Structure formats: structure tokens, C-alpha cells
Amino acid sequence: MGNAGSMDSQQTDFRAHNVPLKLPMPEPGELEERFAIVLNAMNLPPDKARLLRQYDNEKKWELICDQERFQVKNPPHTYIQKLKGYLDPAVTRKKFRRRVQESTQVLRELEISLRTNHIGWVREFLNEENKGLDVLVEYLSFAQYAVTFDFESVESTVESSVDKSKPWSRSIEDLHRGSNLPSPVGNSVSRSGRHSALRYNTLPSRRTLKNSRLVSKKDDVHVCIMCLRAIMNYQYGFNMVMSHPHAVNEIALSLNNKNPRTKALVLELLAAVCLVRGGHEIILSAFDNFKEVCGEKQRFEKLMEHFRNEDNNIDFMVASMQFINIVVHSVEDMNFRVHLQYEFTKLGLDEYLDKLKHTESDKLQVQIQAYLDNVFDVGALLEDAETKNAALERVEELEENISHLSEKLQDTENEAMSKIVELEKQLMQRNKELDVVREIYKDANTQVHTLRKMVKEKEEAIQRQSTLEKKIHELEKQGTIKIQKKGDGDIAILPVVASGTLPTGSEVAVGNFVGPVMGAPSSGPLPPPPPPLPLSSDAPEAVQNGPATPPVPPPPPPPPPPPPPPPPPPPPPLPGPAAETLPAPPLPPPPPPSAPPLPGTSSPTVVFNSGLAAVKIKKPIKTKFRMPVFNWVALKPNQINGTVFNEIDDERILEDLNVDEFEEIFKTKAQGPAIDLSSSKQKITQKGSNKVTLLEANRAKNLAITLRKAGKTAEEICKAIHVFDLKTLPVDFVECLMRFLPTENEVKVLRLYERERKPLENLSDEDRFMMQFSKIERLMQKMTIMAFIGNFTESIQMLTPQLHSIIAASVSIKSSQKLKKILEIILALGNYMNSSKRGAVYGFKLQSLDLLLDTKSTDRKQTLLHYISNVVKEKYQQVSLFYNELHYVEKAAAVSLENVLLDVKELQRGMDLTKREYTMHDHNTLLKEFIFNNEGKLKKLQDDAKIAQDAFDDVVKYFGENPKTTPPSVFFPVFVRFVKAYKQAEEENELRKKQEQALMEKLLEQEALLEQQDPKSPSHKSKRQQQELIAELRRRQVKDNRHVYEGKDGAIEDIITALKKNNITKFPNVHSRVRISSSTPVVEDTQSWQASLFT
């Protein structure tokens, strides 16, 4: 640790020249125990401690050995005693000179100990016994006293210098007064009170001044500031420093030191404190003290003087400019901010920054630019305020115009939707008529085909008959047969025997020719002909067969080919040459060929679904890389018949796409209560203010309130109900009155009171009204009818747009060819990704569209939906605006079709009830007019409801979903979400392309500059660095970065590190014509550190 060495040089040399041997590693249990102790002593943040716990045993043992080797050798009181010895005014000059030679080394070792030792050592140094902070602040005040005194003596006489020697004593008073520290941050009373007394009630001596001059020539002030910085890096120490009455003042007074490095360190520490809420007030108070002590005419005068004069030390100038930037612009109060800005303006900051605008220091340029970017231009702000008022008036006017236009747009949309629905209904009707015409055409076409076939067969039969007649005449000429005409016009064919006589026997009839058949008996009637056998169309004409026995058996009939009509049986063979002359029956036609395979397949392998439609089996797709799984919900092959997926071909899409690029992007990485009659009788006997009430108290009270709202008498109300007069009784009153329809028990109580002939005057107004109200015939029906009539128009106006939106959305989704193409692309890419693991599918559930955003590319920068959007834009530009074909989908998504259909049924029941009432009172013109005017409207609404239901069922089935389990509130939002996500993906793709293009242009521009200039020239290097800084500033202006420093050990170091990296250059509430204000660096205030963050 930092306090490893002893104070004397011998021990220091011994440790420097003796390296201890490495001890053997203990058992793992003991190792872990000792390692836990070391970690606890180091007081590390949780993330760093977690990192050390991940070390292996060898590294853990090395860390333990290092920690035990550099153990704390000097307790805190050792350093405190030495510092107190330097502050002893009674010590001689010679002895002080000998002691102070090692003061800087003591302070350095103290700083290292404060920075590296465990928190317990620091707490011991700061406790009530040691009061290390008081001693350290007192020594800092002593070390820089001479600098302040010498500076004042330049501008004043010797007498005034003695009088002005009070600041050192004032600055270190009360350090030993009480042991309790004052209350923390913002306690200005303790700071102002220090001017009332001197440390020793005496003026500093000449010896003290000379000793201080001796110390000021060393680095003691710088190392003291480092010690205070190390203390402030702990939560406990930070609170003590902020609570100390003089610590921050002495740090600020250290700006009088002649070392620029010390002044830069002071400004960095003060800037870090300034970024803590509440710290800004402390810093300003310290500079008020600085002004008084150093005799400044204006606050920050010496700071600006150092800033101007130390122009050869860039680090100090950067720290000064950074401090000015933070102390001015980290204030949220705009007026106070302008005040601080004007303080520096009076000190000449603006003119000096104008001179420094061409500085070659990039860090200084960044701080100057940050200050200028956050400067308030009050004149411009006033002009902006006036412009803002005019703009607000214009905005109000535009908002009013937008409101009117929105109303007109809504009316136009409703009108357009009604027209669209009418057109869609006509289209659906025409489609149905077209389907009927197609069926009729199909049947007529079949009949025509059959008739043509019959005509063709008849022509062929006539031709065969003519051929047979020719053959018969030829045989007759040859003398083989003889033709004999009968009386009935038939012709008998008689065969001729060898002796030339014609034997008697049976005859052969061929067509209209009849002849005896050889070998058949001549007597007896002919037997009936055999049943016809099916033959081909080339078979000979029908011949009646007799019982004759032919000399040669007939050939078997050919097999019947499907599906010709059955012709007559074939003729028997003729004897003699006739058997040889007649043509033989033709061969049967070949069997019909098998059905051809589906288009696009090389194999006849098919799958038959329940509709007997053949579906080709999809082969798995082999990919080069392992692809992520797209977790869609697939449809089974028997579920796609009649859906959109039966009409698309995803394999054809894959031929158009660059699947290699796709693989490269998405490859994987690794009502009231009943009234009791007995209780009602008891209420009759009770008297309250000479009135009897039969109704329940709350019910009577509510009825009285309702009747008072109407302002009508009971007679007027009952008469209006009887004639359905909605002009006298508004529908709202009717609906309220329906809650007070008399119950069965109330009617019994009222009738009992009436039968007992008790005076009605004793009843309350509500009971008398209920007496008349309950006597109205069919009261429930009449009240229901009145409410129905009163709400009918409103119900029609409410339900019609909902049904129209369902119809329009359903038809537009089903008829969208562009949407079908999008689904085709999704199916193709999904099968490409899943085929090797899950196999190809034929369709997917619509809920799978929501999963497109969950499937991300290998670099996690884009999703599958982003890729699909790119593919559509590059290869299928014509379908990129598919969402323009989907009409009123968002409105349809908000409709509960089931409830709408129930409301339509309720309207029908109300109309039926009204019709029945009208049949009983046909003289009522109000009911007659209502039925006449609105029955057609209800019929149209019912037709719309039927069309909406059918259209929705069709589109749901078309996409492979179940209408019973997929209501509109589930079906349509899928498309709403998909369209929204698709549009967003398009925008993000476009933005990404623009960014890539801008980056490419920037790189090309830089390359061109590099080619034009000498890369080694200083001006080229400076310009490139400035361009990089400006680009960094622009990026930070775009982002909303809030610098939040939480209360934890090391917070001060984090702030100072951020300051050195120029990470805090933007501040809140900056309004300018040119730029947009950036966000505030926010740091937890000191009180929150003490109250909550340190617990």
C-alpha cells in the first residue's frame, strides 16, 4: 500500500533492496478465507470485487501476498504529529528548517495512504481523536499564507500588509474549537463567522511568515490538495470536507499558488464539486471568500488574470475554461445563469475567447466551443419569445382548423365506407350470380358434349348400316343369299343351299331385312332377343339374334371402355363366305391415361386431403449454414384447401431471391330486493308526518328524485306512457323510470291498501304515483317499446358503421393480391429457414406474423421483417404498398361482432314487440309511423349484419382460421400490428441506408482530402482532429446524455475523469436560434449522498 515504507530512509532502503520470497499456497479453504479478508479491506466496488473473485487460485494467492507484503506500517497519528510539529510557532527557525525538509515526503506518503489504504485507516485519520482533516486544512492554510501575504504586499503598504495578514488567521480559526463538525452543505453562517475572531487572538508573527515562505517554495500545497482529493473520493470523507467550515475556502485560495499544475488541480477539484447539487453554492461562497481575502474588486478577477497570463500552460487554460464553463452553465435558474455569465463578460472573457478561437489545442477548443454553444443571448431570447407568442397563436388557429378538418374527414370516411360497403355488397351479389351462371354453363356444356357424342355415334351407325346393305347386295349378286320382301315391308334374307333351293327355317333380320337362318326350325315363334351388351362405338348395327346355331362360334365381345353408352348386341356370324366377308369387330380402345402430375413437380408423389385435392409433398431444403427457427404455427396439409395458401407457390419465390445473402444475414450463432308483505303492513301502521309510505325508503327516495326531474304530474306521465308519447317523456326519463317498475310484492301491498278503502290522501306522493303507475296495462311492454323507439335511431347510427367496417375490411383483405404476395414471400423464407429442422409446411397461422420481429439476424441489427421489407422493395416493388389495399382494418379491429349481432337481434325483438302492440292498438298513429319509417332500416341493418357475418367467416376461413375461435377483435389486430411493424421496418431500413450512405460519403470525402494534402503536415493533422471533434460534438447534441454520478466511493474521481475526457460540455435550458438545447449533467447532491446513498 501507499504507506508501505517507514519514515526513515534506512527502512525505506531495506524495503527497496529486499524482495520477499513467495510463500507456498495454503489449502483452498484457508485461501478463500484470507482472500475474502483482503477483498473486504480493499473496499472495492461490487463490480470490481466480482471480477477479482473470478481469479484462479494462483492469482488470488499472489494478490494476498502483495497485500500482506505492503501492510500499513504507520498509523494515522504518525502523520498528524509530524504535521502539527510543522505548525508549532514556538519552534526555532533552525529546527523548523531541519524538520520541514521531509514535509513534502510525509505529505506524499500520507496521500498514498489515504488513496490506497482500506476505509478503516481513512476513518481513523478523520475521527474525533485525530482530527486529521482539521490538521491538514490548517497546514494547507499555513503553507499558502506567505503567497497570499506577498501578493497583497505588492499592492499595499507595510502597515496595510500587517492589517491584511488577518486572512490566514481567519482562514484557520476554530479548527481546534469544538470536536463536533457543523451541519453539512450550504452552511454559510459558519463561513461568515470566521471573520469575527483570530486563531490565537494575536496577529501572525514574522517567524510564521518566514516559515510559510520556506514551505511555499516546495510542493506541499499541491500534495495537500491531492490529500484532500483522496479524502473526498470516499463518501465519508466527502461529507466531512463539504461540512468543514474552511476546507473548500482553502482549496479555492490555493489558486494563488505560482505552480500552474497546482492551480489546474484545484480547478479540476472545484469543478467536480460544482457538479454536485448544492456544490455550486459552496463553490460560489468559496470565491466570495477569495474576493474578500485577496481584495478583488469583482469575483473571479484573479482567476481571469491567471487565465490570461498563463497562456503558455495549456493544461491550466483547459482546466480554467472548463471550470468557467461549468460554474456558469450548470445552473438551472436562467436569470442566475445570465448573472454569472455577465460577471465573466465584465472581466473580458468574451474578448479573450475571441482571441483564442484559433488556438491549436483541441481540448481548449472543445471547452471554448462548449461555452459559446451554451451562452445566453438575451436579445435573441426576447425576439424568440415574441416569435413564440405569434407561433402559439398560429398553432391554436391551426389546431382549430385541424379539428374542423378531422370532423369533415370522419364524415367523409363514414360516407365513403357506406359507399364501399354498398359496392362490396353488389360485388358479392354479382359474384354469387356469377357462380350460379358458371354452374349452369358447366351443366349445359356437359349436355352439349353428350349430345355431340350421341350425334356422332348415330352418324357412325348409319354409316355402318349403309356398309352392311352394300355387302348384302353383293352377296345377293353372288347368289349366296336371296332377298325376299314381305308384306309388312321387311326384307327376308334367305340363304341359298347347294341344290339351289331355299330351305324353310328361321330368318335372319338385319336392320329392316329379315331372312331365315340356316339350321333353325321353321315352326314356332322367335324367342326374345338377348339383353344388349356394351360395345364400342365402332360396333356393327343392332341385329336380332335367332336360336340358330352358327357354324362358327361368335367372338367374345370386347371389354367395355368407360364411359360410352350401351349399344345393341353384336350380330351373329353368317354362314359361308358371309362370315369371311363381313368385317370383324374392332379392338377395344386403349385405357385412359393416368392423371398428369401437378405443375412444378418432377415426381407424381401426391398427398390427398379431405377435399380429395392432391397436394405435392414438399422436399426439405438443404442450407449451407444452420438457420434460426421461425416459430410459426403451421397449417396441416388437409387444412389449406380453400385457403389463400392453396393459391400461392413459395418455391417459385425462392428462385427469385438471393438465398445466399439470406443465409449470411440470418445464420445462427453459436335489480331491487323483494318487499316482505308483513313488513309492508307494519309500515302502513307507522305514521311519519301524517303520511303513509308503502315503498322501501331508499326506493321511494330515488323515485321522488326521478319524478322531480321530469316536472310532470303522475296523470301526465301515465297518459304519455299509454300513448307512447316520447315528446312529453324523453327517452332518458323513460329509462330511469324503468328502474322503478312495480314488483309483485309492491303491487300486492298497493292493491291491499286499495281494497281496505283507506284514503289515498294519506299516502306519500311516490306511493300515489306508484298506485297509478301500476294500473297501466302491459306496463313492462309499453315502457320497453318507448325505450326501444327512443333509442332506435341512435342504435342504427351506432351499429351501421361497425358492420360496414367489418364488411369493408373483410372483403379488402380477402381480395388483396398484394397481401397474398407478401404471405407467399413469408412462407418461402420460413420454409427455407425451417425445412432442414422441421420440414416444409404448406401454410401458417396468422399469429405467426407477430413472430417476424422475434427472428433476428446474426448481428442482431435487423429482424426477419426488415429483411422481407428489403426484399419487397428490391424485387417486388409493385406490392410494397400492400397496406393501401387493406381498408378500415383498424376500425374493424375495435368491433365486437358478437355484441353487434346481439344488438341487431335485440332491435328485431323490439320491432316485433312494437308490431304486436300495434295490432292491439291499430289507432295509434305514432306506432304506425314508426313501423312504416323504420322497418326498412332494420331490414337493411339485418342484411348488413348477415353480409358482415358471411364476409368475416369467409375471410377467416380463407386464411386458415376458425371463425368460432377467431373473432374480429383477434383477427383484424393481427393485420394492424403487421402493417404497423412493416411500416416501421421500412422507415428503419431507409434510415439505415441513409446513415450508411452518409458514412460512405464522409469516408470518400476524407480520402479525397488525404489525397490532396500531405498526411504528415501539421495543418492536415489539426484539421482532421477538428473535424473529428466537431463530429463528436454534433453526435452528443443529438443524444440526450445525462451525466449522473451516484453517491459511491470513487465518485469524485469519476467526475474528474469525465471532465478530463471532455464528456461534460452541454448544459440545460439553452435556447438559441441556431441550436437545440442539450441536456443537463446531473449529479447527486451532497445531502442525498449523506441521507440515502451512503446508507
From Swiss-Prot:
Functional description taken from the UniProt entry: Plays a role in the regulation of cell morphology and cytoskeletal organization. Required in the cortical actin filament dynamics.
Record-annotated FH2 domain positions: 617-1008
Cellular component aspect of the GO annotation: cytosol
Swiss-Prot/TrEMBL keywords: Actin-binding, Coiled coil, Cytoplasm
Designated name of the protein: Formin-like protein 2
Compartment(s) of residence: Cytoplasm
Coiled coil: 381-478
Location of region: Disordered: 521-602
Alphabetical list of Gene3D superfamilies matching this protein: Formin, FH2 domain, Leucine-rich Repeat Variant
Ranges for domain GBD/FH3: 23-469
Record-linked InterPro entries: ARM-like, ARM-type_fold, FH2_Formin, FH2_Formin_sf, FH3_dom, FMNL_animal, GBD/FH3_dom, GTPase-bd
Keyword Transit peptide: no
Similarity-based family: Belongs to the formin homology family.
Entry keyword Repeat: no
Organism: Bos taurus (Bovine)
Sample GO molecular function, one term: small GTPase binding
Note on domains (UniProt): The DAD domain regulates activation via by an autoinhibitory interaction with the GBD/FH3 domain. This autoinhibition is released upon competitive binding of an activated GTPase. The release of DAD allows the FH2 domain to then nucleate and elongate nonbranched actin filaments.
Pro residues: bias regions: 524-534, 548-576, 583-599
